[in-house]
From Swiss-Prot:
Tissue: Expressed weakly in peripheral blood leukocytes, bone marrow and spleen. Expression is confined mostly in monocytes and macrophage and seems to be up-regulated by IL-6, IL-10, TNF-alpha and IFN-gamma.
Sequence ranges on the Extracellular membrane side: 39-215
Subunit structure: Heterodimer with CLEC4E; disulfide-linked. CLEC4E acts as a bridge for interaction between CLEC4D and FCER1G to form a functional complex. Heterodimer with CLEC6A; this heterodimer forms a pattern recognition receptor (PRR) against fungal infection.
Disulphide bridges, residue numbers: C84-C95, C112-C207, C182-C199
Protein name: C-type lectin domain family 4 member D
Length: 215
């Protein structure tokens, strides 16, 4: 009596034992395609990202908020986005964060540094006019300016060159009374301007960090 041969192939000609291997190969190919696509997108985004000038570490911040800045170029390629950490204020490629708890100057700088920033430098009247919109007139805010050696040589903490012609002191300031070698931005005499104060004086502060620019 003749015996039937066991069926060795499925309809269509594929051996049953090959099916798991084929599925595994297809799955690996799909993963490879997804990985390559992810790498291309990451590379594209990274190549578009241009950091602003100065020392900063936006990687300290999990989320960014981007604001489109005006550009003289009308084309889409000429548009620029300035990105800052959430809750920071954006102005001309920089980011600002006022904090109202009181610390000494050194403590304030350490706090800003922990966020990848420095105490605020002020280079123009426009920059000062921008930040005062977000300040409390009842408070004083440390800036990143001090006379570290008490010799009348003012320096910005982030090494920004100090321009003695671009200063915004209150009248009769700085007076260097009682070793006042640090600077606060304070509202007095109906305007915001600078006063020198002792560095162990406790005040609020403004942190500043260069933003990330996307073209």
């Amino acid at each position: 009596m003749g015996l039937e041969k066991p069926q060795s192939k499925l309809e269509g000609g594929m051996h049953p034992q090959l099916i798991p291997s084929v599925i595994a190969v297809v799955f690996i190919l799909l993963l490879s395609v997804c990985f390559i696509a992810s790498c291309l997108v990451t590379h594209h985004n990274f190549s578009r990202c241009k950091r602003g000038t100065g020392v900063h570490k936006l990687e300290h911040h999990a989320k960014l908020k981007c604001i489109k800045e005006k550009s003289e170029l009308k084309s889409a390629e000429g548009s620029t986005w300035n990105c800052c950490p959430i809750d920071w204020r954006a102005f001309q490629s920089n980011c600002y964060f006022p904090l109202t708890d009181n610390k000494t100057w050194a403590e304030s700088e350490r706090n800003c540094s922990g966020m990848g920033a420095h105490l605020m430098t002020i280079s123009t009247e426009a920059e000062q006019n921008f930040i005062i919109q977000f300040l409390d007139r009842r408070l004083s805010y440390f800036l990143g300016l001090r006379d570290e050696n008490a010799k009348g040589q003012w320096r910005w903490v982030d090494q920004t060159p100090f321009n003695p012609r671009r200063v915004f002191w209150h009248k009769n300031e700085p007076d260097n009374s009682q070793g006042e070698n640090c600077v606060v931005l304070v509202y007095n005499q109906d305007k915001w301007a600078w006063n020198d104060v002792p560095c162990n004086f406790e005040a609020s502060r403004i942190c500043k960090i260069p933003g990330t620019t996307l073209n």
